[in-house]
């Protein structure tokens, strides 16, 4: 063997050793390592080095030609492998026989490409994070607040809480709280918001449905309490109709519900009048005087009189008698307390023309 032949063998050994070093440096499985070594061995052993019997100069020329062609062939294969990797071909698409030792570095190249693609993707995501202008945010706040309020109202009206209520009645003397509530026409199915917004209308229902109520107001306390304040007309006396007693209110109206004699109060005033217009006028006039004087009247009669058609006779509980025209009750009867304190025997106090008294 010549010196050039030994150099060829040494170059082949160096290639194999380089391949072995690359395999050891890569973290691949033993099976893959054996496969790559077999391929390179096949490439290295498939090329037979011809034995030459020609002179040394001819052998050197032939060897140089063979070496140049072999290096060109290897360079061509390397370029083909690199192009296949760039075009995204997988290892399965490349025949096992055409793989070279450069396949060992494709994993590193792919990892590098993956890192580059992730970096580019991250940069794209960062570029998409655009700051929203403050003007847009301030314009969106009213819309969001309105939407939230509407949603809250919708949930409130759907829930049973919107109809759950507590009703209290204040100022009632003869009427019960249940009666006042029924007169208001407030229904359990009515929304609390509806009652609060139309409180005046419900209060008018009480006055309309009950002649005993003088004033009525409804006040709302959060969250669901309604207080009904009423003032009842004073009862100035009672009239008897067909063995039934009816209260006469200070408004001039006659109560609609009859009362038995056993249910009458101890100090009640009996009104012996039949004309409804006179009864109404009498009730209005008596409603203007002091309640103490009004409670001191036992009976009210209308005796016939040629001089004064509306002259009334008041029989007082202390035994005195008062004569007074119906149209002047609120003006003259207020003096009765002072006059009654001055007499010691039953006395008739005549207020028809002026005011004077004489013993009964």
Swiss-Prot record:
Biased composition (Polar residues): 17-28
Membrane-side (Extracellular) residue stretches: 161-360
Database matches in Gene3D superfamilies: 3.40.50.10960
Transmembrane segments annotated in the record for this chain: 140-160
Stretches assigned to the POTRA domain: 162-233
GO CC entries: cell division site; plasma membrane
InterPro entries per the UniProt record, alphabetical: Cell_div_FtsQ/DivIB_C (IPR005548), DivIB (IPR026580), FtsQ_DivIB (IPR050487), POTRA (IPR034746), POTRA_FtsQ_type (IPR013685)
Basic and acidic residues compositional bias, start-end: 31-44
Subcellular location: Cell membrane
Region (Disordered): 1-54
Job of this protein: Cell division protein that may be involved in stabilizing or promoting the assembly of the division complex.
Family: Belongs to the FtsQ/DivIB family. DivIB subfamily.
The protein's name: Cell division protein DivIB
Classification lineage: Bacteria, Bacillati, Bacillota, Bacilli, Lactobacillales
């Amino acid at each position: 063997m010549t010196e050039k032949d030994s150099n060829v063998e040494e170059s082949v050994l160096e290639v194999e050793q380089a391949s072995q070093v690359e395999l050891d440096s890569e973290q691949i499985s033993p099976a893959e390592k054996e496969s790559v070594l077999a391929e390179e061995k096949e490439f290295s052993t498939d090329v037979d080095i011809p034995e030459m019997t020609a002179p040394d100069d001819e052998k050197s020329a032939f060897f140089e030609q063979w070496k140049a062609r072999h290096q060109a062939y290897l360079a061509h294969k390397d370029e083909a492998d690199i192009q296949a990797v760039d075009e995204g071909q997988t290892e399965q698409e490349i025949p096992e026989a055409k793989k070279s030792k450069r396949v060992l570095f494709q994993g590193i190249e792919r990892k590098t490409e993956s890192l580059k693609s992730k970096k580019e993707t991250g940069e794209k995501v960062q570029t998409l994070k655009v700051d929203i202008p403050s003007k847009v945010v301030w314009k969106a706040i009213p819309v969001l607040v309105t939407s939230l309020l509407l949603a809250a109202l919708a949930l409130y009206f759907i829930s049973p809480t919107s109809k759950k209520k507590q009703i209290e009645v204040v100022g009632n003397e003869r009427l019960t709280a249940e009666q006042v509530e029924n007169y208001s026409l407030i229904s359990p199915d009515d929304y609390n918001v509806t009652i609060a917004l139309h409180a005046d209308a419900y209060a008018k229902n009480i006055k309309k449905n009950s002649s005993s109520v003088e004033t009525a107001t409804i006040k709302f306390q959060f969250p669901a309490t309604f207080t009904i304040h009423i003032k009842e007309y004073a009862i100035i006396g009672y009239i008897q109709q067909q063995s039934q007693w009816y209260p006469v209110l200070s408004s001039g109206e006659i109560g609609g519900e009859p009362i038995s004699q056993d249910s009458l109060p101890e100090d009640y005033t009996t009104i012996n009048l039949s004309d409804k217009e006179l009864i109404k006028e009498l009730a209005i006039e008596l409603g203007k005087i002091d309640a103490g004087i009004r409670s001191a009247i036992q009976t009210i009669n209308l005796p016939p009189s040629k001089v004064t058609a509306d002259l009334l006779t008041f029989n007082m509980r202390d035994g005195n008698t008062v004569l007074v025209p119906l149209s002047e009750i609120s003006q003259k009867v207020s003096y009765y307390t002072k006059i009654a304190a001055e007499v010691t025997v039953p006395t008739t106090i005549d207020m028809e023309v002026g005011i004077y008294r004489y013993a009964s």
